[in-house]
Every structure is written in structure tokens, then in C-alpha cells.
């Protein structure tokens, strides 16, 4: 299987997001990379399901709370940005203050 660099990056992000989801399900608090991967992978999947940019921006802010992440992580993450593919092309999705 031959993947472009972008496809490899998306696959790695998906894998990291799945690992973060498993850790969250076990009750572990997520660290910085796990938090970014968790939110990003959920956004990419929601875009694939047909959600709009505006819907993704709102959805991304509902995925995690301060109780889901390690102390200080919420203050470290001001925005999460991800390029997602939509029927009309690739767009940048920005979620402001994703952990509330």
C-alpha cells in the first residue's frame, strides 16, 4: 500500500486518537498529545460523516471537559486546527477553547 504523506499523517492521527479514546474509556486523564489527537480524530470522522464546518466547530468543544484531561492541559490548548475533507474540498476547521 502506497500512502501520500498527508494520508500517512491522517492514519497516524487516527491511530493516536483511537489510543486516546481507549485510555479515556479506562478512566485515565489525557495528556497534551492525547487530547489533541482525540479531538482531531473525532473532527475528521465527523467531517467524513457529512457535518459542516460550523457544526464541527461546535462539536469539537463538546468532546472533552476539564475532568477528562490532566491538570493544566485545558490552559495549554487555546485552539485546535485540523484540515478536513468535505464534498466541496478541504477546509481548515478551528475549535476555539475546546476544553471547557
Swiss-Prot record:
GO terms for molecular function: nickel cation binding; urease activity. It comes from the Bacteria. GO terms for cellular component: cytoplasm. Pathway: Nitrogen metabolism; urea degradation; CO(2) and NH(3) from urea (urease route): step 1/1. Transmembrane segments: none annotated. It is found in: Cytoplasm. Belongs to the urease gamma subunit family. This is Urease subunit gamma. The lineage of its organism: Bacteria, Pseudomonadati, Bacteroidota, Flavobacteriia, Flavobacteriales.
Amino acid at each position: 500500500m502506497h500512502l501520500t504523506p498527508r494520508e500517512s499523517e491522517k492514519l497516524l492521527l487516527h491511530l493516536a486518537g483511537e489510543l486516546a479514546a481507549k485510555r479515556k474509556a479506562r478512566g485515565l486523564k489525557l495528556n497534551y498529545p492525547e487530547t489533541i489527537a482525540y479531538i482531531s480524530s473525532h473532527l475528521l470522522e465527523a467531517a467524513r460523516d457529512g457535518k459542516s464546518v460550523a457544526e464541527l466547530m461546535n462539536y469539537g468543544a463538546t468532546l472533552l471537559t476539564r475532568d477528562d484531561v490532566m491538570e493544566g492541559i485545558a490552559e495549554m490548548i487555546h485552539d485546535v486546527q485540523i484540515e478536513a475533507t468535505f464534498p466541496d474540498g478541504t477546509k481548515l476547521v478551528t475549535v476555539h477553547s475546546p476544553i471547557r
